[in-house]
């Protein structure tokens, strides 16, 4: 990928730990509404309590049997997905106008960062033009998805982001049609010889994505947004 992205001055990376979905979503919206043209971009790294989130294109029939897992109607793009412990969620709060990034270019950056992260563990992954996310093909030639994407643009700024399955209980995915695709197989890095923990994966993924977008200074923070 050879995107011509101007160098960005500063990125703040926040480590949120494990959080419920709704308060983090509310904080993303507030951050985006209140930011100015001088506000540094932020990445938020988080693991969520178990939750299904419906995107703006989500259809009720893709929620097969949510059971006791709550369902949240979100304002991100895409359809239904599952978040839970052991999954790396990276929210990207980027001023795309300042970065001179199109939405498609930002999606490409997200997918490329994931693919580069997996390549460091000799996992050959790929993106698909007609179905955002990152996929692998197993030894039987069957395709499986291990990362989902969903963004929202407001005031020329992005929020929401990506979810990469690391080492989690995968059974909740069987109770939905992931991303609106019936029978979509899901997998995770720990089953492919890749990162075994969110902590192991997030350092690589954050560095890859920050490099692609071109941040000159990266500051880490553990505080609540």
Curated annotation (Swiss-Prot):
Manganese found in the keyword field: no
Domain BPL/LPL catalytic: 37-217
Enzyme class name: transferase
GO BP: protein modification process
InterPro entries per the UniProt record, alphabetical: aa-tRNA-synth_II/BPL/LPL, BPL_LPL_catalytic, Octanoyltransferase, Octanoyltransferase_CS
HAMAP family, alphabetized: LipB
PANTHER family to which the protein is assigned, alphabetical: LIPOYLTRANSFERASE 2, MITOCHONDRIAL-RELATED, OCTANOYLTRANSFERASE
Annotated protein name in UniProt: Octanoyltransferase
Gene: lipB
């Amino acid at each position: 990928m050879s995107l011509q992205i101007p160098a960005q001055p500063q990125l703040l990376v926040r480590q949120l730990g494990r959080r419920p979905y709704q308060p983090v979503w509310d904080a993303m919206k507030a951050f985006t509404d209140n930011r100015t043209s001088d506000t540094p971009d932020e990445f938020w790294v988080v693991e969520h309590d178990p939750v299904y989130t419906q995107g703006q294109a989500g259809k009720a029939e893709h929620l097969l049997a949510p059971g006791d897992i709550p369902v949240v109607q979100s304002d991100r793009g895409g359809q239904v997905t599952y978040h839970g412990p052991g999954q790396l969620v990276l929210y990207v709060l980027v001023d795309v106008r300042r970065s001179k990034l199109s939405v498609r270019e930002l999606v490409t950056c997200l997918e490329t960062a994931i693919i580069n992260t997996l390549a460091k563990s000799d996992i050959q992954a790929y993106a698909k033009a007609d179905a955002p996310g990152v996929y692998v093909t197993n030894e039987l030639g069957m395709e499986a998805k291990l990362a989902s994407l969903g963004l929202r643009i407001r005031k020329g700024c992005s929020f929401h982001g990506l979810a990469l399955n690391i080492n989690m209980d995968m059974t909740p995915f069987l109770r939905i049609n992931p991303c609106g695709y019936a029978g979509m197989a899901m997998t995770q890095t720990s089953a492919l010889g890749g990162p075994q923990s969110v902590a192991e994966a997030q350092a690589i993924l954050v560095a890859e994505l920050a490099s692609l977008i071109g941040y000159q200074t990266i500051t880490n923070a553990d505080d609540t947004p």
